[in-house]
Amino acid sequence: MRKHIKRAVSCLLVLAMVCGMTGCTTYNNFKAAFFPGDKVAQEKTIKIGIYEATSGKLSDQGKQEVMGIELANELYGTVLDKKVELIYGDNQSSMYVGETVIQELISQNPSVILGSCGETVTLIASDYIKAASIPAITISSTNPLITANNEFYFSATFEETRQGDALADYAYTGRGKDVVATVKMQNDDTATATIKRFTNRMKKLSGDSKCIVGSYELPADSGDYTQVIEAIRESGAKAVFLALQPAAAQAFLQQAVDLRLTHVTWLGERSWNNEDLMDFIKSQPKLDVAYPSDFSQKVSTSRTEEFVQAYKKKYGEDMEPSEATAIAFDAYLLALQAIEDAQNMVMELTEDQVRARYETEATQKAAIAEWKQARETGIPTGRQIKMMLEQIENFNGASGIISYNGKNEATKSITINYISGGKEQTAYVVG
């Protein structure tokens, strides 16, 4: 009897040490390995991994995304009559930590992984996700390499340079601006690509190859933008695309106000969804500003209303949800729909129908093995979920209508938020 007690105490001590030193992710691995009796309960749950930066320099964004996932989980906590269990991995905003964390998450066999914010920590996870054949959905990372190099990594937002098309549509079709200029920082490749799409779209819409009256670059080592601002004034531009990050944009706009260049509409990037920049713009009644976003309460679907109501109920009526939280809410629901669709597909297909989908004997055997596994466990495999995620069309999300159209890059409407006279005006939607 004493031996049994000593062994139990030893296990508990080791467990406490492991949990204290390495955190909950390692604890879950420890529990799965040494307490197999819990496997019955695990079969009644479907796991969704959260690979996010909840500490480190990206933690503000990471925490906002986790809020959206958890809120969706509170509203929709089951799928296929099974409880959805959220398992967490904090990459600490570090590619080195992220490499370990993603492997720990994968070892717990999640059906889908959500995250991360931050391009580097997302890219470092990509190869492991692909090797494990687990579909993942990045919520806010927009680097095209994430989805281009990995068919298992999906985006829940629009590709970065597409905002150039949307802003051109807004400027020309929505506001009648047919004489425009562009501004970017020197050596900013992403801004260069986005501006190229903007200018090409403007030329196509207007039918005028000379509608771009100025293309300006700002030196990274100088904060004096007087020369460029005066050049814009002389150009006669009616709208200016400022492909600048929030801090530089605020400095530029402040100087434009000081120099009384306020008769133009300033078009910004998605990154302008920034609290400090928004506070500044709203404090300047002479500024006329528009910028793209995945989310606006002024453009509402039934899911948007559900999301906002749930958010305010949990966090307070005076609290406003961020774009990141809305997209994360959608990413979780996209995962659930793909899981449900995948299992429905499995149950509808016969073994012969599965075999007929593949040409070689090896692929047929692998597909049939996964088909049998899903039927036995009641949980579809990663490949099956990935297949159905690709097929999602016209998904009604809090951040808009989302489709994948057989790919892993989201196609969705882009909302152009508009602030004039210090107040938010009616938003414009580009399909």
Residues covered by each model-derived region:
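C-terminal motif of bacterial Sec signal peptides marking the signal peptidase cleavage site
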Residues: 19-23
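Extracytosolic ligand-binding ectodomains
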Residues: 13, 24-431
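Bacterial N-terminal signal peptides that target proteins for export
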Residues: 1-11
